[in-house]
A protein has these predicted regions:
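N-terminal targeting sequences that direct proteins away from the cytosol to non-cytosolic compartments
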Residues: 2-94, 181, 192-217
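Short acidic-hydrophobic surface loop/beta-edge motif
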Residues: 61-71, 96-100, 143-146, 157-159
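Extracytoplasmic
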Residues: 70-74, 102-106, 150-152
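A short acidic-to-branched-hydrophobic micro-motif
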Residues: 96-122, 169
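Solvent-exposed loop/turn segments at secondary-structure junctions
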Residues: 114-116, 159-162, 193-197
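Signature of long, low-cysteine stretches enriched in small and polar/charged residues
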Residues: 128-180
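Short hydrophobic/glycine-rich mini-motifs in sensory/regulatory modules
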Residues: 180-187
């Protein structure tokens, strides 16, 4: 059964909001669910379109896949000492989530097997929209450079969430698996924590970000 990308992202976001954050941005929390008000857009009447919305409008479906179940693509993140798997039934099936303690800092990895044709460049032009619509979002860094040879978009920033200032990192990669199938995947990797603990948590966060892997087997 194909899961609509928007709904899967919403579920993950809701989990982050209710109890899961870091020094590098997690735009799962930014997508703090269904309809976060576009507080940082220049025209509130026309908020930016998310990548999930773009893909849905293009007729593209997405089926969640556990990263460790992939056979035509290697997708993984490391687990620093003191971090452990974070389980929540609201997360999309197959989501890999690790946290230090009961909530933040947290890292989340989701993979969607895509069904349908679309313009990758156009899709990635919408990759940062959800982050930019978070409350009082302040951009710190962005990149549209490929990641390990795959089309990608990255954004870092800080934003307000439930009375706390968060610092988050989000990267979306659109990768094509090994032949002969050459399946296309959307990979979303996010890391989030409290902004006031950014320096303290930086070593672990940097380890996770640097260890994020997307490659052909």
């Amino acid at each position: 059964m194909t899961v609509r990308l928007r709904l899967a992202v919403t579920a993950a976001a809701a989990v982050v909001m209710t109890g899961c954050a870091t020094e590098t941005p997690d735009y799962q929390s930014v997508w703090s669910t269904t309809t976060a008000p576009p507080t940082t857009t220049t025209d509130a009447s026309t908020p930016p379109k998310s990548i999930a919305a773009f893909l849905e409008e293009s007729g593209v479906g997405g089926q969640p896949v556990a990263p460790d179940k992939l056979t035509d693509l290697t997708v993984s993140i490391p687990t620093p000492a003191g971090w452990q798997p974070y389980m929540n039934t609201n997360l999309a099936p197959g989501t890999r989530t690790i946290a230090k303690g009961d909530t933040y800092p947290m890292a989340m990895l989701m993979v969607f097997e895509l069904d349908g044709d679309f313009d990758v460049t156009q899709a990635l032009s919408h990759a940062n929209a959800d982050a930019q619509m978070s409350e009082n979002f302040r951009e710190l860094n962005t990149s549209a450079e490929p990641f390990n040879g795959f089309p990608s978009s990255m954004i870092e920033g800080s934003y307000d969430l439930n009375g706390s200032r968060m610092h988050s990192y989000n990267r979306i990669v659109i990768a094509t698996g090994a032949p002969p199938k050459a399946q296309r995947y959307l990979i979303q990797f996010t890391v989030t924590g409290y902004a006031d603990k950014a320096a303290e948590e930086a070593p672990d966060i940097e380890t996770i970000i640097k260890g994020f892997t997307v490659k052909l087997p």
